[in-house]
From Swiss-Prot:
Keywords: Cell membrane, Membrane, Transmembrane, Transmembrane helix. Disulfide bonds: none annotated. Belongs to the DedA family. It is found in: Cell membrane. One of its GO terms (cellular component) is plasma membrane. The chain crosses the membrane at residues 7-27, 51-71, 134-154. Pfam families: VTT_dom. The gene is ybfM. This is Uncharacterized membrane protein YbfM. It is a multi-pass membrane protein.
Length: 162
């Protein structure tokens, strides 16, 4: 938590952007905590509220797009080769692909709010070759809502705390 605060204090919007891109791709970065801190900093006028939402949105969406592309280009061969080590055998992959075809776009929106799920929905969307325009549209809706909610929570905490 202190490291997140220090990075934001030292590098501002660049730190927010990079932490979200890398966190969405899969590095262990506490995204929700980070955005709540960002929201708090918007209350204390260290950061601008609207710009923080915009930068967070762009970082989250870029991270989702990178993950989608990795899933689309390398996902299926990687799963075929190494999936058995993490419980993703052919039968389970077929279930996942069927589920993603049916609920995939909506899982992108809901998945943002479930830690761990947002990280895999993007890869599985790419593996399942979801249409890129559909993917970007639903990922963008989810990214905006997710960033807005957590940054606003942090801002409200700042207002209540004072």
């Amino acid at each position: 938590m202190e490291l997140v605060q220090q990075l934001i204090a030292d590098y501002g919007y660049l730190a927010i952007f990079l932490m979200l891109v890398l966190g969405i791709v899969g590095l262990p970065i506490p995204d929700e905590v980070m955005m709540t801190v960002v929201g708090y900093f918007t209350h204390t006028d260290v950061l601008n509220y609207e710009l923080s939402i915009l930068i967070s949105f762009v970082g989250a969406l870029l991270g989702m797009l990178i993950s989608y592309m990795i899933g689309r280009k390398a996902g299926r061969p990687f799963i075929d080769k190494y999936g058995k080590w993490v419980g993703l055998k052919e039968k389970r992959m077929m279930k996942v692909e069927k589920w993603m075809k049916k609920y995939g776009p909506y899982s992108l929106i809901l998945g943002y709010f479930i830690p761990g799920v947002r990280h895999v929905t993007c890869y599985f969307s790419g593996i399942g070759k979801m249409d890129l325009k559909t993917y970007v549209a639903f990922a963008a809706i989810g990214a905006f809502l997710w960033c807005f909610v957590f940054i606003t929570i942090g801002r409200v905490i700042g207002i209540i705390h004072v």
